Amino acid sequence: MRHYETMFILKPTLVEEEIKSKIEFYKEVITKHHGVIETSLDMGMRNLAYEIKKHKRGYYYVAYFKAEPSMIVELERLYRINEDVLRFIVIKYESKKEVEAWHALVDRANKKPSHAKEKHEKTEHTHSHHTEEAESVGSHSE
């Protein structure tokens, strides 16, 4: 399975129940095609960068998932035929570096420290520990 991110923007005229229904529909599309949703971000109503179909605002939703490439065609088709979807994008993460970035985004969305950040913190902790030892040795020699 490959790593993907999808974001879609729904019309601002939808009521809360309709928004939840649309979100659940797209989540089910992913899971019914043997995809695994790692995490998602419900970003809520936001201003659009520019007007789309006479709308200045839209409801944003992002999902990070793993799926087979064949499922993406169906997901994009369903986005296109739904009049309530103003815009959508599906991003595929391919290279090792991109997959690491995908994991970092998932960790951030889940409010966990990312793998890269943990490595940095361990290095920083070791460095500060050595600095403290050096300072304490220097103060004893006076």
From Swiss-Prot:
Residues 110-133 have a biased composition (Basic and acidic residues). GO terms for molecular function: small ribosomal subunit rRNA binding; structural constituent of ribosome. InterPro entries: Ribosomal_bS6 (IPR000529), Ribosomal_bS6_CS (IPR020815), Ribosomal_bS6_sf (IPR035980), Ribosomal_S6_plastid/chlpt (IPR020814), Transl_elong_EF1B/ribsomal_bS6 (IPR014717). GO terms for cellular component: cytosolic small ribosomal subunit. Keywords: Ribonucleoprotein, Ribosomal protein, RNA-binding, rRNA-binding. GO terms for biological process: translation. Disulfide bonds: none annotated. Gene3D superfamilies: 3.30.70.60. CDD domains: bS6. Residues 110-142 are annotated as: Disordered. PROSITE patterns: RIBOSOMAL_S6 (PS01048). Pfam families: Ribosomal_S6 (PF01250). Binds together with bS18 to 16S ribosomal RNA. Belongs to the bacterial ribosomal protein bS6 family. This is Small ribosomal subunit protein bS6. It comes from Helicobacter pylori (strain ATCC 700392 / 26695) (Campylobacter pylori). The gene is rpsF.
